[in-house]
Amino acid sequence: RGAHQIQDEEVNELPGTYGDPAKAIENFPGMGRVLLSQGSLFVRGALPNESAVFVDDYEIPDLYHFTGSTSVINAPFVESVELVPGGFSARYGRSTGGVVTIKTKKLPTDDVHGFAKLDLIDAGAYAGVPLSDDIAMGASARRSYLDAVRNIQRANGGTGDAVLLVPTYWDYQLKLDWDTAPGHELVVFAFGSGDREEYIADGSGALDPYLRTNDSDFHRLSLRYQHNVGSGFTHTF
């Protein structure tokens, strides 16, 4: 079926990913680069609505934020990313372009893990905490701050009569892994994302009526129970 997969440990070896596993699929054959103001996929020349994205078998509307600079799932939660450009299972719906599946990572129970980051576009943080030898919880949040910088600039005189596009995005993830018994695992995963693009005019600048604000957001809550029956077979509910 011509599937292409990448594991999280391979990401740092690929150019242009900036440590984001989902950005790696742009290097796969048949993939088009994400355009500014679109977080959608371009697989083998198909329209974005002809492809689909799934996180742990739950479909989401977009893989990337509108800026195209980052995906909607933070890297610490990603175990693997797979692109299937054709011949995929009917359980993925009526997509004709391609399917991207993201598998989330089992949280470690050995120690506390975490980080915080700040760059030119956004700020975010992640923390993973073991609650016991069998239970671990992880949480992450990220938000861009270009709109805040823009507000400060406007408060100090703005940029004359300029009309500028100001993108804003955010996302969050909250995950609980519980090994209820040997070979049995309960996973609760809540995640969501939001994007907003707004045109702002300073001074006497007038907005073109065709320049409209663009909003998009989604939220998902998944509950999964998995039983490893042996010989490589599992039951998932």
Residue ranges with predicted function:
Residues 1-89, 99, 103-106:
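Periplasmic N-terminal accessory/gating domains of Gram-negative outer-membrane beta-barrel systems
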Residues 20, 26, 38, 68, ...:
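Transmembrane beta-barrel architecture of outer-membrane proteins
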Residues 48, 58-60, 105, 121, ...:
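Structural signature of outer-membrane beta-barrel domains
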Residues 65, 111-113, 156-163, 205-212, ...:
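Extracellular loop and loop/strand-boundary signature of outer-membrane beta-barrel proteins
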Residues 68, 150-156, 190-193, 198-207:
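Outer-membrane beta-barrel translocator domains and adjoining extracellular loop/strand segments
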Residues 68-71, 79-89, 98-129, 139-143, ...:
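Short strand-turn segments of transmembrane beta-barrel domains in outer membranes
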Residues 93, 97, 111-115, 136, ...:
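Outer-membrane beta-barrel architecture
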Residues 119-143, 160-196, 213-234:
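Transmembrane beta-barrel wall of Gram-negative outer-membrane proteins
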